[in-house]
Amino acid sequence: MIRIAAALCFLAVAFGAFGAHWLKAQLEERHMAEAWHTAVLYHLIHAIALFVLAYFGTTNRGAWWLLFSGIILFSGSLYLMALSGMRWLGPITPIGGLCFLAGWAWLVISPPKL
């Protein structure tokens, strides 16, 4: 789990740089620069949370998988919409947001034993 979390952190930083340099003009032309930035921000925040949970060997695997799913669905759908213009992916984004909320709620109800 820690390797997955570390890879997700790596990808968040890489996608941030990719969007800021190589994709900047394309994203601005499509009016998707803000969506890309939001995707990177939420991706990185939740990847760090996954890393911390994995590092401390938490037994909250449900919360871990919900946060992981949130990255895939929320940030992933925004990345794909920004790159492809496929607006039909829009309804997937809030499902990812709900996964984030559910993962954090799980941690509130059942905090990890660090």
Q: Could you tell me what each predicted segment is?
A:
Residues 1-114:
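Polytopic transmembrane helical bundles with strong interfacial aromatic enrichment
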